[in-house]
Structure formats: structure tokens, C-alpha cells
Amino acid sequence: MGIKQHNGNTKADRLAELKIRSPSIQLIKFGAIGLNAILFSPLLIAADTGSQYGTNITINDGDRITGDTADPSGNLYGVMTPAGNTPGNINLGNDVTVNVNDASGYAKGIIIQGKNSSLTANRLTVDVVGQTSAIGINLIGDYTHADLGTGSTIKSNDDGIIIGHSSTLTATQFTIENSNGIGLTINDYGTSVDLGSGSKIKTDGSTGVYIGGLNGNNANGAARFTATDLTIDVQGYSAMGINVQKNSVVDLGTNSSIKTSGDNAHGLWSFGQVSANALTVDVTGAAANGVEVRGGTTTIGADSHISSAQGGGLVTSGSDATINFSGTAAQRNSIFSGGSYGASAQTATAVINMQNTDITVDRNGSLALGLWALSGGRITGDSLAITGAAGARGIYAMTNSQIDLTSDLVIDMSTPDQMAIATQHDDGYAASRINASGRMLINGSVLSKGGLINLDMHPGSVWTGSSLSDNVNGGKLDVAMNNSVWNVTSNSNLDTLALSHSTVDFASHGSTAGTFTTLNVENLSGNSTFIMRADVVGEGNGVKPWA
């Protein structure tokens, strides 16, 4: 400490300048009494140390560990506990750094091998680089527990963290940055990871999170992964955001986001149980689906948004695969697809249930489907809005599938000639079914080709388009309209048209002058108004209502 006194004043009644040259000195108070107000605390200096091995390891705050010792396989490590039944107790304090750079082998950051071991740290940094491979943290021992506190970071040029054998890991505001390997791997029955709030996983070349309760003792229960406000950002071919295998439970809390940017890199791929609210999924690669469920149930709540630039939005395909995608009136969900479909159920026990959801499909003029059920799949929707660009079809069912829609339904195709609702006949399959009941605003045509379509239009419905029923395979098209309007745009036929205080308008959107629009109905009932263009003034431009 140096004290500079001005004007030759050597008394301690004036402290003009105090220069503190040691971090161990804390200035509490300036005053005329001089130096008795200065508190001296013990000096703690961060130390550099080499690899740590043993069952009880305690590292001081701020220390730096550099891997300089090889394990029996000849690979450098930072911290390691012995294998076996002796528990390890590893306390890495606050702000400790573990660096391992193995220029010729497998770099290992922290390896916990003993049964019932514990690892404790806060604001830990692990940075590993290996020539052949690398792992930031590997919890190998049975029933190990790791608490990484707040703000810890794992960096690796291969795998980030691997945990298994019914072990647990907790952290918050946690960061994993890695390349080539998986960011976080959760193996075995009973293994669980809770990343708290605000954690981030960024990988280049592989999957962000893999979880699978596929081995070990099933009495320990499912493998579990929990986080909220989680960000996953992955790049690379087939690099999925989250890969959920059987016997796994994932809870993504609220405001989590998943982004992938590789071909076939699905945002969420699941055989397990997944839940999330206000989830955002954005995938940009070719054939990359936003959410693909192959088994189990995935439940996604309000204010969730799925976007797939070149693939499907939601898809179920597999045994008892279910997606519940539920927005609310105040917080609607959305799906955008620049690929094949917005939502698709593709096998006999595959189901998608949606509420309060807006679906947009735009494949730049190529075929795309808003809702697509096939091979016995089923889709239900309540209060849906579907927008289809040129080349798209709104709702489509084939190969013995079913779609059921209730409440408000909006289908807005780019022209009335495009298919808003349609079924397809396929030899050897029972007729597919599409049922809709509620207030409908439909811009597009309805075509029953070897299928059964039943539309029950509630008051305020408006349909602009044409209809077709080919009656193949027992197919039918039945429409009931109550205080609704059908603007017929071209020649149409259907099996049943039941009208109550409604209007069928051939004039406003019909064929051009000089041509006729024909409507064939097998069973017509009710009391409503037909508006037709008639040649009552000599030039074919007269419009006359018929009751």
C-alpha cells in the first residue's frame, strides 16, 4: 500500500490519496482518524494445478485444472474418481476451470466412476479438445449425483455430457457448446437431468439432447429430462434437436426453443412422453420435420409455434403415437410448412389432436397438404384456420383415415378451384371420412372421391367453391347449411343438401356470362334462397332469386 501526502503534511489527519495494490485490502471508510478504518482480509490467489484423481477432491474457488495425467488407456483427464463401490466426493467450489487438450487421444474433462459419488460446482467451466474424441463430463458410477449450480459451461469438440446408471444432474443457466458429438446424453432407467431455467445447448454435427431409458433396472423408472426456457440450436445432417427414446419423460416447461439447420434434422423426434408450453420449433433443412412422434404422447400447450421450411410441421407415425397441440383463444398455436404438410397422422394408431391452431402451407406452387390423414391415421381439430398457397390442398384423407373438425373452421385456398376438403379412393381400403361441424369460412372446393364427407355449417358460414361426389366405394358428400351462404363457382354435385334459411348463390362467383353452372343434388331439402343468373333481359345478365 502506498499513501501519498501532499504539501508536506506528514500527519495522519488527512488521507489525500490511497492506492490499493493488493486485492486483499478492502476500504470501508475514509475519515480523519486515518488507517484504523481499513480492513485487511486474507489473500486468496487462484492456483494452477494438474489432473486430480481420488475419492475426495476439494478445489479452491477460481483454481485452474489442466489435464496433464493419462488414465490407464493413455488418455488425458482433468478430474477422475476410481471405479468401484467407493463413493467419490468432488467439490470444485466456485469459478473453477478444467482444461484438457489431448493432441493424440481422447480428452476427458471430469469422469465420475464410483458408485453413489457426488460432484458439486458453481460457475464451473470445462473445456476439452481431443484428437480422436472428447467428453466434457461423464457420470459413469451408479446413482451418482452432480450439482453444477448456476452458470456452468461445458465446451467440447465431441460429446458434451454423458450421464447414465440412474444418476442425476442438476444445473441452471447452464451452457453446453460442442461439435461432432451429442450435447447431452441421458442413458438408462432412472437417470434424470434438470437444467432449470435459461440453459443453452449448441451443437454442430450431432443431436442436441438424446434420452433413452433403454437399459438398467426398470424398477428405477423412466429416464427424465426437465428444463424451462431452454434453447437448443443444432447444425448438421440428421442432427436432431431432441431425440426421445422409449421409457423417457421430457418436460420442456415454458418458452423453450429448438432450432435445427440440417437435412433430415427433425426438431423433436420422440418415442416417449413429452410436454411443453409456449414451445418454438424452427427447422430449415430438407425433409426436416418440426415434431415427429413415433410412439408415446407429446403434449404441446398454448402459444407454441412450429415452422418447417422444407418438411412437415407435425407428424405421428407408429404404434400409439399421439400429438396434442393445444392453443387457446387468447394464445393460438401456429404451424408453417414449406414442405409436404402442416400436420399428418400416418398409421392406424397415430393421432393428432389440435385446438386453436393456425396452419399455413406454401411449397412454392408444388403439392402440399394442410391436414393429411392416411393409412388409418386420425386427426381432430377444434377452431382451426388453414391457409394454402398455390398448389396446396387444405384437408385431405386417404387409405381408411379420418379427420373430425369442430367449432370455427377457416380454410382459405389461393383460389376457389383448389381443394379445400377432399378424400382419395385407394383400392383395397375402406372409404376415408371427413366430418366438420361449426361455423365455416371456406374458400375452395370440396371433393368426395371414394370417401365420406359430412359438413354441418352453423350460422354465419360462407363457402365459396364447388363440390363433387363420385360415389365410388360407397362414398358420399352431405352438406347441411343453417343461415349460411354457398357461392357456387362451377358445376357441382353432392348427395344431400339440407338448407335452413340459407342462400345458394350461382351468380356472384359463378361462370362467366353465356355459360351455365349446374348443381346436381340427390336429396335436396329445406327452405332457402337460390340466386341464379337468368336470361330475362335478353343478354343473360339478369339475376333473380328463387326460393
UniProtKB/Swiss-Prot annotation:
It comes from Escherichia coli O157:H7. To B.pertussis prn N-terminal region. This is Putative uncharacterized protein YcgV. Pfam families: Pertactin. The gene is ycgV. InterPro entries: Autotransporter_pectin_lyase_C (IPR012332), Pectin_lyase_fold/virulence (IPR011050), Pertactin_central (IPR004899).
